Amino acid sequence: MCFNLPLPHLPPYLPFITSSFFFFSFFPFSLTNTDAPIEFETTIIDPAEQTSHHVSESRPTHLSFSSSSESPRDQSREQSSRDVSASPVFPKRQQSLLRLDEHMAGGAGESRDEPHGEPSDDAHKSRASSTSSSSSFGQSWNQSSASQRASVSSMGGVDVAQKRPGPSSGGLTGASAASGMPPAPTSQAPAIPPITPQMQTGAFEQYTPQTAPPIPTQSQLGQDGRKRAATLDRQQQYVPSYGYSSPANGERGGPTGGTPGGTPMSPGGVAHVTSPGGGPSAASVHRSFSTTTPHAPTKNSRRIVSTSAAPMRKQIDDANAALGRAVDPSRDSQPMQSRDKRSKSISSRGGMKGVFSNLVSSMGTLSRKNTTVRRSESDTSAPSTPKISGPYDAKHVTHVGFNFDTGEFTGLPKPWQKLLSESGISKVEAEQHPQAVMDIMAFYTDQKDDGVWQKFGGANQAGSGATATTPYNAQNGFSPIASPGATTPTLGALNLGTPLSVDLDTEGDTSTSTGGGGGVGGGDYFAKPRSAPFPPAAGGGSASSSTATLGTGATASGGATTATPAIPSRDRTRESSLSSGTSNQGPPVTPLALSQSRQNLREEAPATPEEKPLAHFVASRKAPRPPSASPKKTGGAGASGDSGAGAAPPSAAPKSPPPRPPPAPPLGVPSVHAPNSEYRQKMITQLEAFNAKRQQERAERHAQKQKLAAAHAQAVQRQQRQQQQQQQQQQQQQSAQQGAMPSVMPQMQHGSMQQAQQSVSGGSSGLTPQQKQLIQQKQLLELQKATGGQVGGPVTSSTQQVLSNPAAAAAASQRKREQRLRKDQQVVARLNQICTPGDPTKLYRNLVKIGQGASGGVFTAYEVGSNLSVAIKQMNLEHQPKKELIINEILVMKDSKHKNIVNFIDSYLHGGDLWVVMEYMEGGSLTDVVTYNMMTESQIGAVCRETLLGLQHLHSKGVIHRDIKSDNVLLSMRGEIKLTDFGFCAQINESNLKRTTMVGTPYWMAPEVVSRKEYGSKVDIWSLGIMSIEMIEGEPPYLNESPLRALYLIATNGTPQLKEPDALSTIFKAFLAWALQVSADQRASASELLKHEFLLTADDVSTLAPLVKAARMAKIQEKNEKAQR
C-alpha cells in the first residue's frame, strides 16, 4: 500500500503536483516536507496465529516528548495501546512495547547517518546478510536474560512518557537499565529508517507523539549552516527511529536499530523483549523519537547504525558461531540491509523521489524569477521624471562662514581653497581658527585687486638691477654705494615680500609707500635688500633682477634670475663673515644640469668637428648624464658653462690634455669604461640627428608661414583693389547723376578705405590709437579665419564680441580713463600746493644713481652752495599707482622734525616727475648690520632706544608708522639711527582714535592688525619687538613660511617663541615679553618702554659704527665676487 503526502508550502502550481502524486503512487516511495505530516504504513503480524494486519497512521515530522508528567496526548496513546493489546493480535499482556525519547536513550554506541533518501546498495547487502543471524540471536537472548525479563515485567512495561532517567537507574531506562547496557549518546538525531519488509512482521501499537519544539535558525546550525539548511529542507529535523525484533522462525528478520549481527538494539539503547517461553512469540516494535538538535546529514541519514559495547559484540559473535556462521569482519562498518527484492524497490523509490524533488525545486526557482521579473518590469514601466535644465549664465554670490557643528567652512571660494593649500595652512589649522583664516583671505583678495603689494608696484621693472657703485675712497671715506638690489619675488600679481595694505578707511589712510627707504640710505630704496619666500606653490612666479638676495640660491636660465622658494637663515652668512673677517664669499650659485652635461661631454670626449653644432644644441636642451664610476667635479655654471663659484677662471690655468685611456682588463673581465664611451658616442649621434631634424622642421615651418603671409597679403590686396574699383564705379555713377556735387557718403567711404589702406601700408598717422587698434583686431580676425587658427590662434568669443560691439567697449574704457585723469589732476593740483616751485637740476649737482625702483630711481647729490650730501627720490607720476600716498608721506615728513626721523628737505615737480629731497644716511639699513654681524644685547638696546624715541615723537603727533622693521631703520657711518618710509603712516585724531586697515609687512604685523580689529599706536611696539628678535636671530619669526601662513601663525600663536631663550638675559626677556603682549591693552607704550631697565643699560650709538663699517665692507666684497663670476 502506498501513501500520498500533502505539501502545504508548495507554489501555486499545486494541481500539477497533485496529479504527479497519483502518477507516482504506483511506485513505493516516500516524500516529506518541512512541518508537513507524514503517513506511515506498518504491517503487524502475530507469529502464533500467522496472521497479519495492515495499519496506517499519519504523524507530524517534528516530534517531542514531555519530560515530566503525562500529557493528555500520552494518556490517549496509552489507551490506544491497551486497545491494541486486547485484540487477538496480542494474546499475552507481557508483550509490551518500550518507548523512549532519544534525548535520554543515548548509549555508548556510535551512530552513522545516510543522506535523506534510500540506503545504498552496500546498506541493502549488509541488511540482507544480518537477517538470518538476528533470529538465532533472539533465541540466545531469550535463554540468557530471564532476570532481565523479570525486571522488565516487574516494571509493568515502561511507557514512553517516562523519558528522563532517574537517579536509581543511573541514566538507563527500561530494558537498557536491566541489561546493564550503557545509554547511547544524545548528541546525534536519528533519521527516518526505510520502510522495509521487517516492518510487515512485527507487533504494532498506536502512538501519537507530542508537538515538536521550534525549528532552530540557520545561525544555530553551526559553521556549515547553509549546507545543513539546504539538506534539512528535504529532511525532517525531528525524525523517528525504529528498532524491530526478528521473528522466531528467522524467515523475516533484519532489525534496523541494532548491530549488523541482529542485536535488537534501538538507537536509544533499549533491547527488545521477547516472551519468557524461550522464543519470540510476537515481534515487538520499538520506535524512539529524537528531539535533539538536527545533525549534519551524512551518507546514511535515513538510518542509525549503533555500535554496542564489547560484551554485546561478544554475544553476537557467540550466537553466530553457534549457528555455524562466520563472523563478518566488516559488520561494524557495513549497514544492515533488507532483502534484495525489497532493496531494489527502495532504491527505485529513492531515485524517483530525487527526480521529483529536483522538479519541485526548479519550479520554485522559476516562480521566484518570474516574480522578480514582474517586479522589475513594474518598476521600469513607471513614467520617468522629466529632466529640468539648470540655470545658465548664473552668478553665485556666497558669504564665507564657518559651521561650528560640522567644523567646515561654508561658501569658501575655490581660489581661497587653493591659496590656503599652497600656503601650507592645513584643514585642521583652518578649522581651529576660522575667523583668522577668513580675515587673512579677505586681506589677500583685497591686495590682489588693488595691486599694491610693493610700494612702486604696477610699473615695468625692466632694468631694475642697474646700480652705480663708487669704490672706497681713503680721503672721503665711504662713498655712496647701493645695497643689494634684488627685487622681491612675485606670486602672480602679488609681491609678497613687500609691505601690504588694504585701504578701507579715509583717503589719507592708504597703505602704499613711495619707496623702500623713505630716508635714503646707502641702499636701494625701492627694491628691498631682502625678499620674502615663495609660497610652496607648483607654479610660482619669477623675479627679474640683476642681483640675487644674499643667502638665496639663484639659477640662470635664458637670462632670467629666479629666487628659490626657501630663504635660508642669515645666521650662516653672519657666522661666515665673523670667521673669515671681511673677505666674505657669496653663496654658491646653483649649477645647471644643462651646463653639467655639456661640460662632462667636453671632458670625456675628444674635440671633433661636430663639437660646435653639438654645443649649440646642448646649450638649449638638457642631455642625460652618462654613468661614471669616478665622481665628477660639479659647480655653478653660467651661460658659458664655466665652473662654479670659488673655482679659478678658465684663463687662469691651461686646459689639461685628455686623460690616457685606462689599461685593458684581463681576459674574461668586462671593461667598466667601454659602456661610457659607447654611450657617449651614441648620445652624440642621437643629439646630432635630433638637432638636424629640429632645424629642418623649423625651416619648414618658417617657409610655411611665409607662404601663408604672402597668400594673405595677396588676398588683402586683391580685396582692396576690388573695393576700390567698386567705389570708383559708384562715384562715377553718382557724379553722373548728381552732376558735379559728389555725395557725402561715398566720400566718407572713400576716405575710410584710404585710411584702411594707409593703415595697412603703414601710413596711418591720421588715425587715433583706438581706431588703429580696432583695425588691427579686424585684420587679425580675418587672418585667423583665413588660416584656420594657425596664425594668431583660434578665434575667441571675446574677440568677436569686441569687434561686433566696439562702441560699448570703447565707451567703457573711455569712462575709466576719464576717471583716472580726473583723479590724477586732483593729485597734481595738491602736489603743486605742497611742492616748491623751481628747477631742482639747478639746485643740486653731481647726481649719481644708486638705486632703481618700479617708478623711478634714487640718486645722491650735493646741494649747490652748502655742499651737503642729500638723497633724491625721482618718481614718474604716470607710473605711480597710488599717487595720493605720496602726498601722505610728504606731509608726515614735513611735520616730523626729529633727530631719529629722516628729515625731509624739499620736494619739486619737474617735467612730470616728482623730486623728493631727503637726508642721506650713508650707513644703509639695519638689515645689512643684522645680516653681516652678530649684535650684543647692549647694541640691540641702543637700536631699540633710538627707535622708540622716534616712535614717541610720531605718536605724540597722532601718527602711526605701521611698518617698523629693519629695512626702514637707517644708520649713518657714526651709528646714528633714524626712521624712514612713511608711506604707511596713518593719522589718528580725536574723531578717529582707532584704525582697522590691514597694512604693513606680514612678518612684522601685530595680531590685531592681522585679525582686522581696531588698533592704535601700540602696533608699532609689537613691530619693534619683532625687530628685536630679528636682531637676535638674524631674521623675524616665520620668515621661512609663506606670507599667508605667517599671517595665520601670527593670528593663532600670538607671541612667537625664541629659538634659544636661555641665551638671553632675564631683563631682555622681560622687555620682549612686555613689547610682544598679544593684548594691546597689556602691551606697553613707547613712553613706558623707554623707562624699562633694559634700555637704561643700553650702549651708546657710537658702538654701532664698527658694525656699519663691517657690513659695508662685506657688501663691497660680495659685489666684487659677483662681478668676477
From Swiss-Prot:
Bias (Pro residues): 651-668
CRIB domain residues: 388-401
UniProt feature, compositional bias: Low complexity: 128-154, 543-568, 706-738, 747-762
Location(s), subcellular: Cytoplasm; Nucleus
Location of the Protein kinase domain: 844-1095
Composition bias, Basic and acidic residues: 51-60, 71-81, 99-125, 600-614, 694-703
Entry EC number(s): 2.7.11.1
Active site: 963
GO cellular component: cytoplasm; nucleus
Superkingdom assignment: Eukaryota
Cystine pairs: none
Reaction equations catalysed: L-seryl-[protein] + ATP = O-phospho-L-seryl-[protein] + ADP + H(+); L-threonyl-[protein] + ATP = O-phospho-L-threonyl-[protein] + ADP + H(+)
Gene3D superfamilies: CRIB domain, Phosphorylase Kinase, domain 1, Transferase(Phosphotransferase) domain 1
Similarity-based family: Belongs to the protein kinase superfamily. STE Ser/Thr protein kinase family. STE20 subfamily.
The protein, known as: Serine/threonine-protein kinase STE20
Organism: Yarrowia lipolytica (strain CLIB 122 / E 150) (Yeast)
Chain's gene name: STE20
